[in-house]
Amino acid sequence: IKNKKNFLLKIQLLYPNKNIKKLNQNLKQNKYFYFKKNITKEEQFKLWSLGEKGILFEKTQTRIYPHKNLFSHVIGQVDEDHNGISGIEKSFNDHLKFNKKSLVTTLDANIQFLIREELMNFQKIFNSIGSASILMDVNNGNVLSLVSLPDFDINKRQTIDDLNYINRATKGVYELGSVFKTFTLAGGLNEGVIETDSEFNDLPKKITCAGKSIGEYDNKIPNNLTAEEILIRSGNIGSVRIAQKIGEIKMRNFLEEIGIINKIKFDIEEVGQPLPTKWGKCKLATASFGHGITTTLLQLAKGYSIISNGGYDIQPTLIKK
């Protein structure tokens, strides 16, 4: 660079946010350095138009993601040097860089597209901040679809809002409510303290625990129900009664065995940790219908898969074996 002062002025016009002081220090060292990576063709033309022989352009390989937003949270991101920093890009960074064999996922693009479209429609209807969905093969844990909204175009990472990065399907931890009642019934059957036709009579519409009220969401729920009917009618009080038969320790152990309240392994690192729970009589009661206890959608899918496939443990996976 012959006239450094003039050059710096031109650069400042092209890149107003560039640290000119640092650039000047680099120029004084008279050493090769990177001015900017991953420039556009327009930027290249403008820099070339400066007519400086000291400006060189390097061609590098980069990834192009044809599906854009569709698999953004699963695929993840890479940094300027194309090292994975999230998702599959990070977990399988070495494989993708140095292994000639293809990495094939279990995901189905058609299913992913349809589910994403439905979630986007629901977000408009309910004006929700975000949403997520997982579709898993209950027999082998293959994840066919994993959607988290809002998502992002992986090809335009520099313009993404931080909230869009959150993988709500695997990282988000939530109180999931009545879907836990399935685990309460399954726990009771597993421990042998109930049968599906076990009768629960004179169920009140409201009980108290530590001075706090627990009631039915629907006062039309009958007072006499079988264990199966408690699940069908989504009864809160009936679920509490089943949980009381199981007991705190056995209920907690059952939820741990099916991977609901302990962190599980997955092919990407963005997996949430359920919040620690101090068990007691009231916690047992509220946990029976999914309140005061947290987990991720990924773990919910695993738990339901185990119940659906006859009790066989499965490991959720994104990679075809």
Task: Identify the function of each model-found stretch.
Residues 1-2, 76-81, 145-151:
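Short beta->alpha transition motifs characteristic of CBS
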Residues 6-13, 22-101, 105:
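Small/polar-residue-rich segments within soluble enzyme cores
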Residues 17, 53-58, 124-138:
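Short N-terminal helix-loop-first-beta-strand/juxtamembrane motif that initiates sensory/input modules
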Residues 22-28, 127-129, 137, 200-201:
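Short, glycine-/polar-rich solvent-exposed loops and beta-turns at beta-strand/coil boundaries
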Residues 32, 46, 95-131, 139:
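Conserved, well-ordered alpha-helix/loop/beta-strand core segments that scaffold catalytic motifs
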Residues 133, 137-178, 183-321:
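Beta-lactam-recognizing serine transpeptidase/beta-lactamase-like catalytic domain environment
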